[in-house]
Every structure is written in C-alpha cells, then in structure tokens.
Swiss-Prot record:
Keyword Oxidoreductase on entry: yes
The family this protein is said to belong to: Belongs to the GcvP family. N-terminal subunit subfamily.
Pfam families reported for this sequence: GDC-P
Keyword Transport: no
Source species, domain of life: Bacteria
Name this protein carries in UniProt: Probable glycine dehydrogenase (decarboxylating) subunit 1
Entry EC no(s): 1.4.4.2
GO biological process: glycine decarboxylation via glycine cleavage system; nucleoside metabolic process
Entry keywords, A to Z: Oxidoreductase
Record InterPro entries: GcvPA (IPR023010), GDC-P_N (IPR049315), GDC_P (IPR020581), PyrdxlP-dep_Trfase (IPR015424), PyrdxlP-dep_Trfase_major (IPR015421), PyrdxlP-dep_Trfase_small (IPR015422)
C-alpha cells in the first residue's frame, strides 16, 4: 500500500532493534488460523464506476440517460473539483472590486485566463462571461468596435440557434442587418454564399461555431481567408473539449474566440449557472469586455495580481465602456481551471477520443436500426440522424428515462424527423447497447 510511511530500509532497522528477522515474526503471537487466507477483494474501480454503483443502490436517485447536447453536455466531473470549490475562500467571497484585494482569488483567475489562452491559441483572455451565449453576443459587439464601420452582422445558420437569438437580442438597440448564411449538404457553412454576402455588404462582424451546432467541423481555414480578404473581424465560438484534438482558431486568423465552459467541471443544473470564456488578440485587448487580471509588482518589488484595463461603465463614462457586465462567473471559471489542471492536455484528449469513438459506434448501430444520415460532413461526438418514426421512438425511449437527442424541427423547418444526438465519455457501451435493444 503506497501510503504506508516506512521504507524497506526503515522496516529492516526497526525489526533489527526488536531482534526480529521478518514482519511475520512481529505477529508470531497471533494464532495462524486467525489470519485471513483470501480477502477476495474485487478489482479496483474508478471514481465514476463507484459513483454508478452507489447510484444503482439508491433507487430513488436514478437519473435519465442523456444523449443530448446542443450546448450542454453530461460529462464526468472529478469530485475533487467541487470539494475544492466548496471551501469558503472560493465559494462565498464576492468578485473583488479593489485592484489589490484578495491575491488568492486574483491569482486563480489569472491562471484560468492563462489556460484559456493556451487552449484557444489567443494572446489574452478575460476573467469570464455569464455563459457561452452572452460571450458570443459580446464578441459580436466587440467585433463591431474593432471594424469601426459597417451595417451588417453575419452569422452562420449552423451556429447554435439559441446563441443566434441572444446575439439578435443584444443588437436590438443598433440598426444592423443580421444575415444568416445557409449550410451545405455537408452540414457546414456555405462558403460561396458567405463570399457573396461579404462582397456585397458592409460587414463588421462574422461569427461561426467550431464544431458547429450539428457537430460538424467547419472549414475555418477557408472562412478565415475570406475574412482577411474582405477585412472582416472573425469571431469563432468553440467547444473547449474539441480543442484538445482540433487546431485552435488562432491558427486560422480568428480575432475573437469564445465558448461555453460548462463541459469542464460544471453540472447541467437546469441550464445554469454556466460560464463563458472569452479570448482575443493582444491588439484588441482595450476593446475586450469584462474583467481582466494582470500580474505585476507592488512597491516592494513583490509579485502582485491586480485588476487591469477596467473599462466597465462603473469605472469610466458609460458611452466609452466596453461592456456593462456587472460580475463575472468566477466560481464557475475556477471549476474550468481545476478541470483543465486535473486532466491536463492528455486527459482532455482522452475525453475527446472516448467521446468520438463511442459516438461513431452508436451512430453505426443506429443506422442499422433504420436511422439515416442528414449531412455528409465530418463530425465529432454530436451528429444529426433522421427517422420517419422519430416521434414514436422518442416517446418510447422517454418512458424508459432515455433522452435520444434534440428534435431539430424546433429550430429548422427543413429538418423534420431529425434528432441531434450527442455521446460523451460518460456513456458506457452497456448504456448504448441498452438503448439499441429497445429499438
């Protein structure tokens, strides 16, 4: 057992002083028949396997089986994350307003910002936003400020429809035209249509999702080249887990990268609280919304963390402020930080690869049951499938506490009888096979 403090040399020294030759001699006074011959311990289990055992033992706590994503994903959360976050130092303090306050909290936020930059490939990240949707909307406003002129915002129709709705809400006070670029048979943004829009309109912001709402990997290289050609600020909404196996948007010329951090250590919780992350290029930092923690030195030359470039309406004239966000999601951001630190690059890559391999298996078996592909593009762990009897299948599985994806006709009229299915590393082969057995 690795936690016994005595080394082999120390054990020999103690036995020598006691006049004994072995540990067995130390217990020679105990009758041999009292010694256990075989403990019959089961094989060791992971934390997640133990959690499932206890859940099954408590019948009243049986949870639905989720194969639904669309921006919120049922992933494994190491229990140590919320053990740490439950400490009073993290759980109860309010976000520090004074620049010098709470060095521990400020350092934690600084470390979070650093890892978000590493994940996205960008130069600077802020202390977090309310959620992914508000981060995207703020990114569009920032892109408008970067461009300085124009009257059109372009959104891919393959971008999460709820996020698009949030952007439209934020833009209600402006006189912008919002153009939604359609998707192709591959399930990705139509590049020909996009170039026509960029050519014919005064565009001051373009936003796409990577991978997109349907789970397909957008051609960021080509989109980035179009943005550079027509001098349009490029906003990319990303999946943080996907970035462990995909090239970061920074390599394709993204000006602003945002995303939803729920997948990294935050439970589903009826839709919140979540956390949005926000990163950009160094040259745009003065137009970035939200709080920003920097590292410097105090008057004694010691390292000190402080809030910097505070351009909220509480600090400067309202009309010159970059945002009016009143607080950040500091506790949720720390959950993201702990998740990234605990899993590391390789751990997050394993999460992504497991999710992808299970998704491919489930998709292949579902297609044997009469489901059909809707698009031809390359996806990760989320994909849409069509079935003529989808509503009947959906109702049947709901009775068994199984949620088979999100019906897409709620958002897209041309996607009748289509469901958007997501498979995470949390789903086991036994669970997947149990669903297939019901079809």
């Amino acid at each position: 057992m690795s936690y016994i403090p005595h080394s082999e040399e120390e054990t020999k020294e103690i036995l020598s002083k006691l006049g004994l030759e072995s540990l067995e001699d130390l217990f020679s006074h105990i009758p041999k028949e009292l010694f256990a011959k075989d403990f019959s311990f089961p094989e060791p289990k992971s934390e997640e396997e133990l959690r499932r055992i206890f859940e099954r033992a408590c019948e009243d706590t049986e949870l639905p089986l989720y194969f639904i994503g669309a921006g919120a994903y049922d992933r494994i959360i190491p229990s140590v994350i919320w053990q740490i976050l439950s400490r009073g130092e993290f759980l109860t303090p309010y976000t520090p307003y004074q620049a010098e306050a709470s060095q521990g909290t400020l350092q934690a936020i600084f470390e979070y910002q650093s890892l978000i930059c590493e994940l996205t490939g960008m130069d600077v990240a802020n202390a977090s936003m309310y959620d992914g949707a508000s981060a995207l909307a703020e990114a569009v406003l920032m892109a408008r400020a970067i461009k300085g002129k124009g009257d059109t915002v372009v959104l891919s129709k393959a971008l999460n429809p709820l996020y698009r709705r949030t952007v439209k809400t934020y833009l209600r006070g402006y006189e912008d035209k919002i153009v939604e670029v359609p998707y192709t048979e591959e399930g990705t943004t139509d590049l020909n249509n996009l170039e026509e829009v960029l050519k014919e309109s005064e565009v001051h912001a373009l936003a796409v999702q990577y991978p997109n709402f349907f789970g397909f990997v957008e051609p960021l290289k080509e989109i980035g080249e179009l943005c550079k050609k027509y001098e349009v600020p490029f906003v990319v909404f990303v999946d943080p887990i996907a970035l462990s196996i995909l090239k970061p948007p920074a390599e394709f010329g993204a000006d602003i990268v945002v995303g939803e951090g729920q997948q990294m250590g935050i439970p589903l919780s009826f839709g919140g609280p979540y956390v949005g992350f926000f990163a950009t290029k160094k040259e745009h930092v003065r137009k970035m919304p939200g709080r920003l923690v920097g590292m410097g030195e105090d008057i004694e030359g010691k390292r000190a963390f402080t809030l910097v470039l505070q351009t909220r309406e509480q600090h400067i004239r309202r009309e010159r402020a970059t945002s009016n966000i009143c607080t950040n999601q500091n506790l949720m951001a720390l959950a993201n930080l702990l998740y990234m630190v605990l899993l590391g690059k390789e751990g997050m890559k394993k999460v992504a690869v497991q999710s992808l391999s299970k998704a491919l298996y489930f998709k292949k078996e579902l297609m044997k049951k009469g489901f059909e592909e809707v698009f031809t593009g390359k996806h990760l762990w989320e994909f849409p499938l069509r079935h003529e009897s989808l509503k009947a299948i959906y109702r049947k599985l709901l009775k068994e506490k199984i949620v088979l994806g999100l019906p897409l006709d709620r958002f897209y009229e041309d996607l009748k009888n289509t469901t958007l299915i997501a498979v995470t590393e949390k789903r086991t082969k036994e669970e997947i096979d149990s669903v297939l057995a019901l079809l």
